[in-house]
């Protein structure tokens, strides 16, 4: 019985870098995997659009030919298609020069359609491999029927897919024992694991241990686990395990060279791998795109993310509907409170006074002498925004999300206890004695991805409070390194995908829109330098 390694870095990694690996990387990664004796190399996807050089979204197999140097007869070169997203009429007859095999991935309930696609592919001379996405959704009876269908077709392989990274050992054991018992031994059984619960490598080991003496098997992996969300089982770990424990013959130097030369560069520019958010995806068997949407667009903390995902039905969790998700997010945030008395109290407090907003930017440190002089001279009503700044004495701290509220409470307990706070109702609906709660929907305006920027929300609130003169400090703009922008180096970042330029551009747009809307009723001046200032 054989154990084969299928490296799908160039295919699964395409989720991370939009398939833009570049010609040198593609050639060298394939070459290094060849040198490492990896049995199956997945070169990318087949897609229904024209090929762009240097990407792994191929239109036809010959598009991959320039990247396969010294094609080896001992290696299968594959590409993947979604069962319903590639027109097989475009697929030419197999010529042996590039792609040898095509993997067809299909969702639960679409087995018959996938087999029909597979027949068309095999009729053109290619090997056919199947991927049963979200295999965890299959009942025992479903698994028997799946095996029966595969026995009629006899593909090269059928792979179990832990789509949401939700499997534990008992789940894997249930699935593979039923399939192994019913599946023709001529069909190899594969595993594609995701690392949402840090179990991808462990599941691969269990898979190998369970089946190695009974049938030929295939294990999917990627270099450094490169793949969407929490990523995949890592090629270097799986290859190392097979070498040490199963008499494998993988050249680890070639694998590590591929990582050092190319994957490390992608790791500097892109993010993948285990995180709390993707653990939640695994916990609830939730599509990773839902997690990415909440993280990217709303910087949702783990507690709120769980509440939102729990509010979805099982079926809704497994697909992604961004409009539905946006509505669920707003439902979760928009906890209605009676804030009429709070608004009136705040209006009285700032009546005819200049208001100074102290945002978290580093300029509040570098320009502290100037800012203190302004405070001494003008005696403004001071509101700190989403962070405590111990250089200044404020009248209130304005918090817009639970992450910053809890960080301030836990990091500066004595200062936090001494300060009065203004909270949005997405944090809590009933404030403590020193907390005023304002309705979340009073200050948000939809239509922007990052509509909950704290300074923008503070300015909207001040406009509702009839503030006339507002002075901004620390609204600097975001730099490109983690927390380089903040006065407090440990302040939790709220931009998980590190797209700082895009975030800055959108805040500029939001500020410009707000500035134009309040012109004539509320004057805004910048005390410290800011990329958002309109001059």
Please describe what each predicted stretch is.
Residues 1-340:
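Catalytic cores and adjacent flexible loops of soluble metabolic enzymes
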């Amino acid at each position: 019985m054989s154990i084969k390694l299928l490296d799908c870095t160039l295919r699964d990694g395409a989720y991370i870098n939009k398939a833009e690996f570049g010609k040198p990387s593609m050639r060298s990664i394939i070459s290094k995997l060849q040198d490492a004796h990896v049995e199956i190399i997945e070169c990318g996807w087949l897609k229904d659009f024209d090929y762009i050089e240097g990407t792994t979204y191929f239109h036809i197999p010959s598009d991959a030919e320039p990247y396969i140097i010294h094609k080896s007869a001992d290696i299968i070169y594959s590409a993947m298609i979604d069962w319903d997203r590639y027109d097989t009429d475009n697929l030419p007859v197999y010529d042996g020069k590039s792609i040898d095999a095509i993997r067809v991935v299909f969702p639960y309930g679409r087995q018959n359609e996938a087999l029909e696609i597979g027949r068309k592919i095999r009729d053109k001379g290619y090997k056919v491999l199947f991927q049963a996405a979200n295999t965890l959704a299959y009942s025992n009876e479903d698994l028997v029927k799946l095996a029966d269908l595969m026995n009629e077709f006899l593909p090269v392989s059928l792979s179990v897919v832990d789509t949401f990274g939700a499997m534990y050992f008992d789940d894997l054991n249930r699935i593979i024992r039923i399939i192994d018992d019913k599946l023709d031994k001529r069909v190899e059984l594969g595993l594609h694991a995701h690392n949402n619960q840090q179990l991808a490598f462990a599941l691969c080991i269990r898979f190998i241990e369970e089946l190695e003496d009974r049938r030929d098997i295939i294990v999917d992996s990627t270099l450094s686990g490169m793949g969407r969300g929490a990523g995949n089982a890592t090629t270097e770990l799986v290859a190392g395990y097979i070498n040490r424990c199963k008499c494998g013959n993988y050249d680890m130097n070639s694998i590590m060279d591929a990582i050092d030369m190319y994957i490390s560069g992608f790791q500097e520019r892109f993010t993948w791998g285990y995180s709390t958010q993707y653990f939640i995806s695994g916990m609830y068997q939730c599509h990773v795109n839902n997690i990415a949407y909440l993280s990217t667009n709303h910087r949702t903390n783990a507690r709120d993310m769980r509440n939102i995902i729990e509010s979805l039905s099982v079926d809704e969790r497994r697909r992604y509907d961004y409009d539905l998700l946006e509505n669920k997010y707003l439902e979760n945030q928009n906890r209605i409170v009676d804030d009429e008395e709070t608004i009136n109290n705040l209006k009285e407090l700032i009546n005819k006074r200049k208001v100074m907003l102290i945002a978290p930017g580093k300029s509040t440190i570098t320009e502290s002498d100037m800012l203190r002089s302004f405070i001494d001279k003008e005696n403004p009503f001071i509101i700190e925004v989403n962070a405590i700044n111990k250089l200044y004495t404020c009248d209130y701290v304005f918090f817009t999300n639970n992450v910053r509220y809890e960080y301030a409470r836990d990091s500066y307990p004595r200062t936090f206890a001494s300060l009065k706070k203004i909270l949005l109702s997405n944090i809590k609906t009933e404030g403590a004695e020193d907390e005023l709660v304002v309705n979340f929907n009073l200050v948000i305006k939809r239509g922007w991805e990052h509509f909950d920027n704290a300074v923008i929300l503070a300015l909207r609130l001040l406009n509702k409070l009839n503030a006339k003169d507002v002075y901004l400090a620390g609204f600097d703009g975001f730099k490109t390194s983690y927390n380089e922008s903040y006065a407090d180096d440990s302040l939790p970042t709220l931009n998980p995908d590190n797209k700082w330029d895009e975030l800055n551009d959108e805040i500029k747009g939001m500020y410009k829109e707000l500035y134009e809307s309040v012109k004539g009723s509320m004057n805004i001046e910048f005390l410290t330098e800011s990329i958002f200032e309109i001059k």
